[in-house]
């Protein structure tokens, strides 16, 4: 059995708004995220990891922010399209591990729902998906509450 690993990263700054979307879950917050799409840093990092594992470039190549059809796009839809491409190339998810870096808002209570959403969109079980959140101990742009970052790693296996 062949295996491939992919890594992804995304970041968005806080801006106007009263909610953010992370892992496909709406989270109330005193800021929104500045983005062309819905700004879901977790799903964007996951898309990059999946695309990278299959050597298909990155999310910007497939869904450029210069293309108005992706304006305010639902990142869950983008994730499903990315996973369809991965599947068409003969790969399936073995596991995915993601880390959200944010001083605020607190993510712990939303993580179980994020796992369910991602597992559903990737046609996998929740046991294949791990989401965790951490702070940067008030250091850097996330520590100053200027934005949110996310890292993602995936392992794919041949179908």
Curated annotation (Swiss-Prot):
Is this entry keyworded RNA-binding? no
The protein's name: 2-C-methyl-D-erythritol 2,4-cyclodiphosphate synthase
Q: Where does 4-CDP-2-C-methyl-D-erythritol 2-phosphate bind?
A: 10-12, 36-37, 58-60, 63-67, 102-108, 134-137, 141, 144
The biological processes this protein is annotated with in GO are: isopentenyl diphosphate biosynthetic process, methylerythritol 4-phosphate pathway; terpenoid biosynthetic process
* Alphabetical list of PROSITE patterns matching this protein: ISPF
Q: What is its EC number?
A: 4.6.1.12
Catalysis: reaction(s): 4-CDP-2-C-methyl-D-erythritol 2-phosphate = 2-C-methyl-D-erythritol 2,4-cyclic diphosphate + CMP
Organism per entry: Cellvibrio japonicus (strain Ueda107)
Subunit comment: Homotrimer.
Q: Which UniProt keywords apply?
A: Isoprene biosynthesis, Lyase, Metal-binding
Pathway where it operates: Isoprenoid biosynthesis; isopentenyl diphosphate biosynthesis via DXP pathway; isopentenyl diphosphate from 1-deoxy-D-xylulose 5-phosphate: step 4/6
Q: Where does a divalent metal cation bind?
A: 10, 12, 44
Q: Which family does it belong to?
A: Belongs to the IspF family.
Q: What role is this protein assigned?
A: Involved in the biosynthesis of isopentenyl diphosphate (IPP) and dimethylallyl diphosphate (DMAPP), two major building blocks of isoprenoid compounds. Catalyzes the conversion of 4-diphosphocytidyl-2-C-methyl-D-erythritol 2-phosphate (CDP-ME2P) to 2-C-methyl-D-erythritol 2,4-cyclodiphosphate (ME-CPP) with a corresponding release of cytidine 5-monophosphate (CMP).
Query: What does the Swiss-Prot or TrEMBL cofactor note state?
Result: Binds 1 divalent metal cation per subunit.
Site-annotated residues for Transition state stabilizer? 36, 135
Cofactor(s), names only, from the UniProt record? a divalent metal cation
Instruction: Output the Gene Ontology terms for molecular function.
Output: 2-C-methyl-D-erythritol 2,4-cyclodiphosphate synthase activity; metal ion binding
């Amino acid at each position: 059995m062949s295996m491939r690993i992919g890594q992804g990263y995304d970041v968005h700054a806080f801006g106007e708004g009263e909610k953010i979307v992370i892992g496909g879950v709406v989270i109330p917050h005193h800021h929104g995220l500045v983005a062309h799409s819905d700004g879901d840093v977790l799903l964007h990092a996951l898309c990059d990891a999946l695309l990278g594992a299959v050597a298909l470039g990155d999310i910007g190549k497939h869904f450029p922010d210069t293309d108005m059809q992706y304006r305010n796009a639902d990142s869950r839809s983008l994730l499903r399209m990315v996973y369809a491409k991965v599947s068409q190339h003969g790969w399936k998810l073995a596991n995915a591990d993601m880390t959200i870096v944010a001083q605020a808002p607190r993510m712990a209570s939303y993580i179980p729902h994020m796992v369910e959403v991602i597992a559903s969109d990737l046609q996998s079980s929740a046991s294949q998906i791990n989401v965790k959140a951490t702070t940067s101990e008030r250091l850097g742009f996330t520590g100053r509450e200027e934005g949110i970052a996310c890292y993602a790693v995936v392992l794919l296996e041949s179908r």
